[in-house]
Amino acid sequence: MVNMKASMFLTFAGLVLLFVVCYASESEEKEFPKEMLSSIFAVDNDFKQEERDCAGYMRECKEKLCCNGYVCSSRWKWCVLPAPWRR
């Protein structure tokens, strides 16, 4: 008797494989891996970081001061959220 989890996993893996094969056959003229990776990791200009006078969360705070609501960690020199033991 086949375990239900194993059969669901195989079904899901089969569907994923079918999707990849269908997509590859439709886009033969494209460079498949490069196109797929570029669409997954596409960076929009709206999401790029702006240059600030202060450092945000998990940013280095050696030269810059941390933005409002963050404190500079004395151990790691990153801007972190304030906690009772960091005051």
Swiss-Prot record:
Tissue expression pattern: Expressed by the venom gland.
Intrachain S-S bonds: 54-67, 61-72, 66-79
Keyword Disulfide bond assigned: yes
Database matches in InterPro entries: Huwentoxin-1, Huwentoxin_CS1
Swiss-Prot/TrEMBL keywords: Disulfide bond, Ion channel impairing toxin, Knottin, Secreted, Signal, Toxin
Residues cleaved off as propeptide: 25-52
Predominant localisation class: secreted
Subcellular location: Secreted
Pfam families: Toxin_12
SUPFAM superfamilies, sorted: omega toxin-like
Single GO cellular component term: extracellular region
Functional description taken from the UniProt entry: Ion channel inhibitor.
Family: Belongs to the neurotoxin 10 (Hwtx-1) family. 51 (Hntx-8) subfamily. Hntx-8 sub-subfamily.
Entry note about domains: The presence of a 'disulfide through disulfide knot' structurally defines this protein as a knottin.
Identification of the protein by name: U3-theraphotoxin-Hhn1m
